[in-house]
Structure formats: structure tokens, C-alpha cells
């Protein structure tokens, strides 16, 4: 379980994340939604231990998150790889630093996505670069997978493959967090939706409960529509 307990991180403009407590369970895919400046990115960075907290703490499986680096996979459209490496070299590099990284799985996914393993990552299209990130993330055998805008540059077939991979990972009791503005693409994928606004959690609901109320994500986000839609 991933636990945020009274986590607070505010910037000089008073934006960020206000005192927040929430738990994320294994076997669930949670959508993290919110406008720019809502606290969504700050929450993800805090979980990834990319910034110091003003207050509170974060644990993954009862251990401080900063001690669980090898258990976390971060997939982002911005890319967290070394652009001058080839996809093959990148896989070799990850093998050295992540004991649970499956090179076999990585190359299988690259082949499935039809990505060249010999060209430098920088020379690939944005969509192809994201496919490298997705392949690496799902080959890490991580217990927590965080995806930040994972569908933006993917074609329809790659989106379908990525959704299938997400569902497969849930069977392995992995915690999955997805941050995106494209609510239509995650509505049938996520089990739970968390909406942030003004640095606080405004909504936290299971999708089954939402559907039983005869609502969808767009209806849930309606009060925040000017903020969520660009």
C-alpha cells in the first residue's frame, strides 16, 4: 500500500499540496485529475521523492518511499531516459541499476510496439520515444507504476496496447497511478478517481460507485470544468 500522511508542500506562490492524507491500494488503477496548479504534479513529485516536503511522510509497503526507488516506475511523455543512447543501450543501462528489470520483457515490448532498438532515442518520434518509456516502465517489475500523460503522443493501436498492459499489471497486485487531461481515454481503465483542486483532494470515488449514481467522469469534473479543460 502507498500511504500519504499529512503531506504538505507549498511554493512561494502558495500553490502546491496542502495537508493531504490518502491511501492507494494494490490491484487498483487510480486516475489523478486536476487543472494546472491543482497540486496534481506536486503530489506525483512528492511520491517520487523529487522534492522535499514541508510536512508529513510517504510510505510504500510500510517503508519510506525514498528507500523504495527500485520499486517505482515513472512513465512520462517528457522522457526520463538518456536521449543519446539507443533503446538497446538504454535497456542494458537499466539492467545495471534495477535488479528486477526484465531485459527480455523490455525487448518483447519494443518489438510489439515496432520500435527500432538501434537508433538513438533522440532520433525517434515523440510517440516512439514514449513507447520506449512504456516498455521500460512495464519491464521493471515495479510495485508502483506512475504514468504522467501516457497517451498524448501515441497512435490508437499503441494506446490499446498500453491499456492492455495496465490491466495485466493490476493482476500482479501493482499500484498504478495515471495523471492525464484525457479523461475519455482512462474512463474505462481506472478503478478509482481522485480530483485535486487548490492543493486539496476534492473528490475520491470508485468508478463503480460513480456509475451506480448514473454519472461519468465528465459529470464528476463538471464543477471544475473551467480548470480541468484547456
Regions found by a protein language model. Give the residues of each.
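ABC-family P-loop ATPase nucleotide-binding domains
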Residues: 78-123, 129-132
Amino acid at each position: 500500500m502507498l500511504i500519504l500522511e499529512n503531506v504538505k508542500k507549498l511554493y512561494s506562490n502558495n500553490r502546491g499540496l496542502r495537508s493531504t492524507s490518502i491511501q492507494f491500494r494494490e490491484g487498483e488503477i487510480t486516475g489523478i485529475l486536476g487543472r494546472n496548479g491543482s497540486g496534481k504534479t506536486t503530489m506525483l513529485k512528492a511520491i517520487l521523492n523529487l522534492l522535499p516536503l514541508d510536512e508529513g511522510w510517504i510510505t510504500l509497503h510500510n517503508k519510506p518511499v525514498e528507500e523504495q526507488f527500485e520499486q517505482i516506475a515513472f512513465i512520462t511523455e517528457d522522457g526520463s531516459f538518456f536521449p543519446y543512447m539507443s533503446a538497446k543501450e538504454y535497456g542494458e543501462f537499466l539492467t545495471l541499476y534495477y535488479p528486477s528489470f526484465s531485459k527480455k520483457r523490455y525487448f518483447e515490448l519494443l518489438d510489439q510496439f515496432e520500435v527500432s532498438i538501434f537508433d538513438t532515442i533522440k532520433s525517434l518520434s515523440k510517440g516512439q520515444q514514449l513507447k520506449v518509456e512504456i516498455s521500460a516502465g512495464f519491464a521493471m517489475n515495479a510495485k508502483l507504476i506512475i504514468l504522467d500523460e501516457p497517451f498524448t503522443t501515441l497512435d490508437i493501436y499503441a494506446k490499446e496496447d498500453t491499456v492492455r498492459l495496465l490491466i495485466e499489471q493490476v493482476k500482479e497486485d501493482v499500484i498504478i497511478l495515471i495523471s492525464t487531461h484525457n479523461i475519455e481515454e482512462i474512463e474505462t481503465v481506472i478503478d478509482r478517481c481522485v480530483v485535486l483542486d487548490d492543493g486539496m483532494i476534492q473528490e475520491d470515488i470508485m468508478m463503480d460507485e460513480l456509475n451506480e449514481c448514473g454519472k461519468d467522469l465528465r459529470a464528476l469534473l463538471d464543477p471544475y470544468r473551467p480548470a480541468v479543460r484547456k
